[in-house]
Each structure stands twice: as structure tokens, then as C-alpha cells.
Curated annotation (Swiss-Prot):
GO terms for molecular function: ATP binding; ATP-dependent protein folding chaperone; unfolded protein binding. Induction: By stress conditions e.g. heat shock. The gene is dnaK. This is Chaperone protein DnaK. It comes from the Bacteria. The lineage of its organism: Bacteria, Pseudomonadati, Spirochaetota, Spirochaetia, Spirochaetales. The keyword Chaperone applies. Residues 599-646 are annotated as: Disordered.
């Protein structure tokens, strides 16, 4: 059985890890980075690039570079009014679903996420030297059912069997507690502020058991929001100074975003930073430059409400877990945004102690996912992970009321049944409206799905007995059934992702992804063949120039013809032809080497074979008095004191 890899599919960056020698190892990508930007770019040549190469084209090609797609996955188009304005690429509705429009071709958020997952899969395969087909993928703890299902679909499109969807804070706690002294029980809080989401989880650790007591969060709060505040400030300041509105210029906006992220990162270690963007735009008077100084105090002032938004989820999580802040032994900091000094201040304020920096905030989640992969694969023993469902699940009952069947922070997997009845006399069917959320009325919560149970015998209201059962699996994905206890009729529903991807659409995307992977492989093969050919032409021409007068005219002509043929082949995209003609030139070029060795032999003595026999002698015999091959002679060594040389 192959390895089960762990993937942290992040908003800003992604990371992949695997268990090696009983420990989780973070795998560097082909560019050498331990994390990979979660960015997909489409070049002017219709090629697709992922990671750093995609990030490199963000400024020059903003409309064809997709980033922060995790903020959209599993959402309906109507839920994204504010988010849509923040990105330069085009997002359009397809029914209720979200699609990303790249030159008229529509991509689902799952497909874009799958391209990132494929990059992580390839990174792991290059490292392990074997095909990878199974993965554990992490999601924010506060992701709802639709977002979890959409993430699972993305894995399937990428050619991965998703063995488990695991919550990011839980994964980080695994990385923190793995192989530690497991006898001592600890209560920890995981404060996870990433690029697009915020989670807080309270866990109890001890004797190999990792039990989540409560979780809370905000799936629309992360580093991107802090960057946007700086961008808005820069736009306003520049407009005040010049009268020019940069928010209408997509290329300028992308430069501002990069500068804002850089400024935010710098302000974690310095009190003041400069934002310098020469030639940001131009008007009739010539080019304009942007130069602004930003202090940490000013940054914290403009983002104060964002920092405040992390406090309430922390208080709710503590309340749901039934513990006070003083009972927390450690606070783990996860996600790059936790490096901001203000975050450390907030943690001290809420929990009364400093946050722990014992795990790498960028890598801990992927490492925890790899450990979970090890547990599922049987490589890791004596570790039990007990997670919870982040939101209450229930149905709509009479009067539009939301009736929860499974309350938030219930340990999963779990199953719960409740008996309901009809609301009207003679009712022969009931419509089950499945919801997720914490509000009292059904309309205020998120619809997961609807289904009907039909064929109920007519009876007075309140007489039929309809048993509704909720089943949440270990991935946090919901299955619901309704059964008429009188007739035994039953109806099941597996809540599908609100992305609306059908099985046939997912299968089509899987096939497209496989075809693209094959195309990528062929493209790489072609590039390597061309590089080898170029290198051989250069080397052969150089040698021909130096040794041309030492080989016969016929041989020289043959080599030059082979070079010309290969040059012509390079103008085409026929990899097989390039390889064949490279081989022809290689064979022809051997003639040069042959002539060189012949002439060296001739110079060494009248006998043309003298050189080669001397060469053989040199390799096996150091002379009549030296040691012979295959024997071991005693040698005296003299120790030299070289202290004076130091």
C-alpha cells in the first residue's frame, strides 16, 4: 500500500507532508519552497502554471491569475457580494453556483483547488519516487458541510482518494502533541489565523487521545482582510495626493496588494515601513510614483475591528468547552497571520498567558494531516483523534422554526434520530428541509438540502410517525434519512456540495485533470529533449571548431548535416523526431572523439595501440615497484604536527 500524504490546502499557501521513519516530514516543491502559493495562473500561451510561477505573473496578468479561491469554495454566488469586489479575476454565476471565467472558459472552485492539489500530489510523488493516490486534506474547523464536500470533490478531481477531511486546528494539535510525553493530560487552545479563515479550538490531550472539546471561528476573516485595509488606505492616500483613483486600474491594484502584504509582514518585526511603488500610474503630466510610510500603530488602528473579531469566537469556544482561560495549559499559534504582534497581545488579554511558538505556524497543519494519514494507514499506533461538528444540524419544523437534531461541538462520527409528525390532516408527503447553523429560525440558517418522503397513508395531523435520522461521518459530511414508522417507507439523502457538481461533472473534471497531467508530462519531455539537443549542438560545434582540421572531410560533412537536421527538428514540436535526430548527431559526433584518441595514440609511439596499452597499464599498475592491482601493501604513515599551520 502506498503512502497517505497530508495536505494543508491553504488560502494563501499550501503545504504537503508525509510520514517517514515515524515522523512527519514537510516536502519541498520543485522550486525548493516548503510551502507553495495557492495560486493558479493561465498564461498568454494558454498554459496553466501553479504556485510560484503563477505568483510571478500576478502583476502583469491579474485577470488570468486566480488566488484565494478557498474563500469561494462551497459557496453560492449570492453569498459572495463583498468578496467578489476584492479580486481582479472574473467570477460569474452559473445558476446558484460560482464559476471563474478565464477567457470565456468557466472553472468551478473545485477545479481551481484541484490544480493546486495536483501540484502538491506531484511534489510528493517526486520526493517519494512512487505514485500517490491517497491523501488527508485539511479544512478550517468552521467550514460547513458544503465547503467540506467541495474540498473532497477537489481531491477527487486531482486524482486523490481523500481518506479523511480533518480540521486545521486539530491537525496542528496532532503535530504539537505527537511523540510527546502522553501520560500527562493537557488542555490546549489552537488559535489559527490564516490567509482567509480564523478558527479557535479547545482540545484535551493525554495518553495518545486528542479530543476536541469545542470549536468556533469565522470563515471570512484572515490575512487577506488585513492586506485589503492597507490597499484601501494606499488608494485613498494616493487619491488625496494626486486625484487619481487607483482602484479602477487592475494592474496597479495588484502591485498595491503585493506591497500591502509585504508591508504587513515587515510590520511584524519593525515599527515602521516604507511603501515605494515607482511608476504606479501616469497622467498628462507624466508618470506618478507612490511613496508612503506606514507605522505599526497606524496599521493596528486601521485593522482594530478585524483583530476584535477574533475575540468573541475565543470566548464562545471557552464557554462551550465549559472551562475558564486559566485552565488552558498552552495556546498554539497556527497560520502566518499569528506573527502579527497585536495577535500575541490579544491572546495574552484573553487567556492570560503567552502563545506558544513550539510549532511552525506554516507547516504544523500539513504535518498533522500526515500523522492522521499515518494513523489511517496503520503506521502510527496508539493515537486516537476525536473531532467535533462545528455547527448545529437540524430541520425546519412548523412555523419556519429551526429544530436542531445534533448540536454544535458534538463528537463525530455521530448519529441521532428524532420522531416528527405531519402538520395537516390527510397529509401524504412531508418535505424535509435540512439546515446547518445556530439561529432560531430556519430562514436564518444555511440550507444543506431538501428531500421528500412520499406515500404516507392519509391520517389526522400528528398521527403519522416520521423518524428523521442525521448521520455525520468522520469527515464531518452529513447523511440524512426519513422513515415512516407506520409503513416502513424510507428516503435517504447524502447532502451534496452546494457547488452543484454532479457525479458526471466531477468525472468529466477528473478526466480533464488526468489529460492535463499527461499533457504536462509530454510538455516536460519535449522541453527536456529540446534542451538536450541544444546542448549537444553547442558542444559538437565547439569541438568541431577546435578539432575540425583533424578529422576527414566526409566525417565533418556528415556531422554538419546531422547538426542541420537537428536544428530543423527543433523548429517543430515533434519530440520523437528531436530525440531521433539528437541520437543521429550523437553517433556522428563519436567520430570526433575517435579521431582524437587515435591521434593521441599515434603521438605516444609509433604503434597506434601503445597509448591505449599504456592507459590500461596506468589504471592497473603504478610501475614495477608500485603496488599491483588486487593486492594490499603495508604502508608506513608519518604523523605531521600541523599546529603551526592553523
Amino acid at each position: 500500500m502506498g503512502k497517505i500524504i497530508g495536505i494543508d490546502l491553504g488560502t494563501t499557501n499550501s503545504c504537503v507532508s508525509v510520514m517517514e521513519g515515524g515522523e512527519p516530514v514537510v516536502i519541498p516543491n520543485s522550486e525548493g519552497g516548503r510551502t507553495t502559493p495557492s495560486i493558479v495562473g493561465f498564461t498568454s500561451k494558454d498554459e496553466r502554471v501553479v504556485g510560484q510561477p503563477a505568483k510571478n505573473q500576478m502583476i502583469t496578468n491579474p485577470e488570468r491569475t486566480v488566488y484565494s479561491v478557498k474563500r469561494f469554495i462551497g459557496h453560492r454566488y449570492s453569498e459572495l457580494t463583498d468578496e467578489l469586489k476584492r479580486v481582479p479575476y472574473k467570477i460569474v454565476p452559473q445558476g446558484e453556483d460560482v464559476r471563474i471565467d478565464i477567457d470565456g472558459k468557466l472553472y468551478s472552485t473545485q477545479e481551481i483547488s484541484a490544480f493546486i492539489l495536483q501540484k502538491m500530489k506531484k511534489t510528493a510523488e517526486d520526493y517519494l519516487g512512487e505514485t500517490v493516490t491517497e491523501a488527508v486534506i485539511t479544512v478550517p474547523a468552521y467550514f460547513n458541510d458544503a465547503q467540506r464536500q467541495a474540498t473532497k470533490d477537489a481531491g477527487k478531481i486531482a486524482g486523490l482518494e481523500v481518506k479523511r477531511i480533518i480540521n486545521e486546528p486539530t491537525a496542528a494539535s496532532l503535530a504539537f502533541g505527537f511523540n510527546k510525553d502522553s501520560k500527562k493530560e493537557k488542555t490546549i487552545a489552537v488559535y489559527d489565523l490564516g490567509g482567509g479563515t480564523f478558527d479557535i479550538s479547545i482540545l484535551e490531550l493525554g495518553d495518545g487521545v486528542f479530543e476536541v472539546k469545542s470549536t468556533n471561528g469565522d470563515t471570512h476573516l484572515g490575512g487577506d482582510d488585513f492586506d485589503n485595509r492597507i490597499v484601501n488606505w494606499l488608494v485613498d492616500e494616493f487619491k488625496k495626493d494626486t486625484g487619481i483613483d487607483l482602484s479602477k486600474d487592475r494592474m496597479a491594484l495588484q502591485r498595491l496588494r503585493e506591497a500591502a502584504e509585504k508591508a504587513k509582514i515587515e510590520l511584524s518585526s519593525v515599527a515602521n515601513t516604507e511603501v515605494n511603488l515607482p511608476f504606479i500610474t501616469a497622467d498628462a503630466n507624466g508618470p506618478k510614483h507612490l511613496q508612503k510610510s506606514l507605522s505599526r500603530a497606524k496599521f493596528e488602528q486601521m485593522t482594530e475591528d478585524l483583530f476584535e473579531r477574533t475575540k468573541e469566537p475565543c470566548r464562545k469556544a471557552l464557554k462551550d468547552a465549559g472551562i475558564t482561560p486559566d485552565k488552558i495549559d498552552d495556546i498554539l499559534l497556527v497560520g502566518g497571520s499569528t506573527r502579527m504582534p497585536k495577535v500575541l497581545q490579544i491572546i495574552k488579554e484573553i487567556f492570560g498567558k503567552e502563545g506558544s511558538k513550539s510549532v511552525n505556524p506554516d507547516e504544523a497543519v500539513a504535518m498533522g494531516a500526515a500523522i492522521q494519514g499515518g494513523i489511517l494507514g496503520g503506521d502510527v499506533k496508539d493515537v486516537l483523534l476525536l473531532d467535533v461538528t462545528p455547527l448545529s444540524l437540524g430541520i425546519e419544523t412548523m412555523g419556519g422554526v429551526f429544530t436542531p437534531l445534533i448540536n454544535r461541538n458534538t463528537t463525530i462520527p455521530t448519529r441521532k434520530s428524532q420522531v416528527f409528525s405531519t402538520a395537516a390532516d390527510g397529509q401524504t408527503a412531508v418535505s424535509i428541509h435540512v439546515l446547518q447553523g445556530e439561529r432560531g429560525m430556519a430562514s436564518q440558517n444555511r440550507t444543506l438540502g431538501n428531500f421528500d418522503l412520499v406515500g404516507i397513508p392519509p391520517a389526522p395531523r400528528g398521527v403519522p410517525q416520521i423518524e428523521v435520522t442525521f448521520d455525520i461521518d468522520a469527515n464531518g459530511i452529513v447523511h440524512v434519512s426519513a422513515k415512516d414508522l407506520g409503513t416502513g417507507k424510507e428516503q435517504h439523502i447524502r447532502i451534496e456540495s452546494s457547488s452543484g457538481l454532479s457525479e458526471s461533472e466531477i468525472d468529466r473534471m477528473v478526466k480533464e485533470a488526468e489529460a492535463n497531467a499527461e499533457n504536462d508530462k509530454l510538455e516536460k519531455e519535449k522541453v527536456e529533449a529540446k534542451n538536450n539537443a541544444d546542448s549537444l549542438i553547442y558542444q559538437t560545434e565547439k569541438t568541431l571548431k577546435e578539432m575540425g582540421d583533424k578529422i576527414g572531410a566526409a566525417d565533418k560533412q556528415k556531422i554538419e548535416a546531422a547538426i542541420a537536421d537537428l536544428r530543423q527538428a527543433l523548429n517543430s514540436d515533434n519530440t520523437a523526431d528531436i530525440k531521433a535526430k539528437t541520437e543521429n548527431l550523437q553517433q556522428a559526433a563519436y567520430k570526433i572523439a575517435e579521431e582524437m584518441y587515435k591521434q593521441q595514440g599515434a603521438q605516444a609511439g609509433a604503434d597506434p595501440n601503445a597509448g591505449s596499452s599504456q592507459g590500461a597499464q596506468a589504471g592497473t599498475d603504478y610501475g614495477t615497484s608500485g603496488p599491483k592491482t588486487g593486492t594490499a601493501d603495508d604502508v608506513d604513515y608519518e604523523v605531521v604536527n600541523d599546529d603551526n599551520d592553523k
